Amino acid sequence: MSDYPMLISNKLHSFRNFALQIYKNSMSYTKRIFLKYILGTCISCFMALQGHATVRNGADQLEKLLPLLEGKQVSLVVNHTSLCGKTHLLDTLANQVKIVRVFAPEHGFRGDADAGEYIQNGKDTRTGVPILSLYGKNKKPLPSQLTGTDVVVFDIQDVGARFYTYISTLYYVMQACAENQKELIVLDRPNPCDYVDGPIREKAYKSFVGMLPIPLLHGCTLGEMAGMINGEGWLGKGLQCRLQVIRVEGWKHGQPYSLPVKPSPNLPNDLSIALYPSLCPFEGTSVSIGRGTTYPFQVIGSPALKDFFQFQFTPRSLKGFDKHPLHQNQACFGLDLRTEKELPQGFSLKYLLQFYQLYQKQYPDAEKRFFSRSQWFDLLMGTSQVRKDMIQGKTESEIRQAWEKDLQAYRSLREKYLLYE
């Protein structure tokens, strides 16, 4: 693990002691108030750093990883979240092992591409290593792309939602490794949305946003999910991936974890990540969740709802967020969830039901207007039942009954593959 957090915390210790001495010796009330503020800030920063420093991700544990790579040709599946301390994993390993190529998932190697944007192949300017995209037509490594590779290292930060596509990339990489007799090492990271909730993906709705028959919130790290994929035979044709997982140290299920790097352009902070499971299904509707603003997945609104809300936002084409957002250059009226005192935990239908009911008040053809991309909505949900139940006017508790039995079965299944308490 990088000694950067320790260095900073040592500096904070020194500054804290210095400020405390001045505070004690100062007779000025104004100075005391100011120094008290500075001292409190230092203590808060120190506590935050101490809490994060106790967690060692798989990539931080080079003492475990390097012996597994010695003398081997290595391919990496990484993006901008693949950090070893403050240094990218590729840069860390480049001078210590033979890296033959890098595979990049959705959003690209640097994590700056829009959702769904085509990613081109290229070459890393710093190391000269070829970079191959696993998003677009080629979502699975080809046999020719694994030629000369002995072991594949997978290190990407996930957010715990089934429709977040990094988990689908993991599935395809495992399948390719199994088919081509390659080892796979997963460098594990905590799950920031560590809940088990939502509908199980039905077979008819298998897609890149629903590759596996798991709940919308699966409650696993990618290391645990890799074990489940292997153990349940989901790779098909009796395939088994030669898998090793370097576990996270200092983290357990239910423990909050703030991501040090945003996992994708439109999940810029902890609030957006927490709301993502509940707001992402809006992508199958005519309601915006703030793409094209600097606060995506933190607001909800539509031009159609001017009569119901005072808060408004206007999606724009923004570099680094979204180039072509829904309702671009149109005022959207709705909710600012950044100001809400109480927000739902895990997955909730609260906002979907609220906005659909407002459309029903506004339009006789509310179903068509609201579910403007109904097929995409169903793929995100992994079932058409949620949409049908909403149209029938069912409450959230009534809708949840449809998946509760399957969810209980999944919870029992999940227990077999947990790597953490």
Name what the model sees in each region.
Residues 296, 301-402:
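Conserved functional hotspot residues or short segments at active or partner-binding sites
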Residues 100-106:
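Short internal beta-strands
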Residues 112-115, 186-205:
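Glycine-rich, charge-decorated loop segments at or immediately adjacent to ligand/cofactor-binding or catalytic sites
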Residues 120-148, 161:
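Glycine-rich oxoanion-binding loops at beta->alpha junctions
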